[in-house]
């Protein structure tokens, strides 16, 4: 029972950190627990994707599919508070508007959104809607699978960067700093097991190719972030999640045609 309660605590901490869903009052959060909660980020993706898929399924019973997709996207934004979208915008602003590493990190930390961030945010949301809408034209039921797989695998991929890259912020004000410390093989194995299980249960014939595509994207993003800022930040993890989610939808659409 103690082990189960401990794992539930870690799951609820991950849920509270990455969503707007409130944690139970008995859950106590500290740096060490948040660090270990990294293992359940994939499950948080499964939760968010499941909520989006449920909203899509309910609304498409009485609304056009395109409108249902918009409601599903809104549900994801409400549940997460636009946490990862904010990271995408900040990353675009930092990498696009800064010359030195220090400038890029300073711009990323600025809460104001710039031109690059606004463009990345608008284009990302538009592309997400278009890809899901095209999937729905081929098979409306496939959108459910896409939402669950996309949200889960993208978070696993984003979290995996922590295990192979250096955290480049040294200020204690960063909310992501505890995630960058003392990661173990256990966290990585649980993350990967979540991805494999969700992909296998989805029954997608192109599941292996999706996994390979995400691995290639991961290498590309690691190279980009290392070249630009020397490692990763919480914002680049958010950007990674968004780009990986879009990549999942794009590959699913390609395999469906």
UniProtKB/Swiss-Prot annotation:
Its cofactor is Mg(2+). It is found in: Cell inner membrane. It comes from the Bacteria. Joins adenosylcobinamide-GDP and alpha-ribazole to generate adenosylcobalamin (Ado-cobalamin). Also synthesizes adenosylcobalamin 5'-phosphate from adenosylcobinamide-GDP and alpha-ribazole 5'-phosphate. Its EC number is 2.7.8.26. The chain crosses the membrane at residues 7-27, 39-59, 61-81, 113-133, 143-163, 196-216. This is Adenosylcobinamide-GDP ribazoletransferase. NCBIfam families: cobS (TIGR00317), PRK00235.1-3 (NF001277). Keywords: Cell inner membrane, Cell membrane, Cobalamin biosynthesis, Magnesium, Membrane, Transferase, Transmembrane, Transmembrane helix. InterPro entries: CobS (IPR003805). It catalyses: alpha-ribazole + adenosylcob(III)inamide-GDP = adenosylcob(III)alamin + GMP + H(+); alpha-ribazole 5'-phosphate + adenosylcob(III)inamide-GDP = adenosylcob(III)alamin 5'-phosphate + GMP + H(+). Belongs to the CobS family. GO terms for biological process: cobalamin biosynthetic process. It comes from Shewanella woodyi (strain ATCC 51908 / MS32). GO terms for cellular component: plasma membrane. Its main location: membrane. One of its GO terms (molecular function) is cobalamin 5'-phosphate synthase activity. Pathway: Cofactor biosynthesis; adenosylcobalamin biosynthesis; adenosylcobalamin from cob(II)yrinate a,c-diamide: step 7/7.
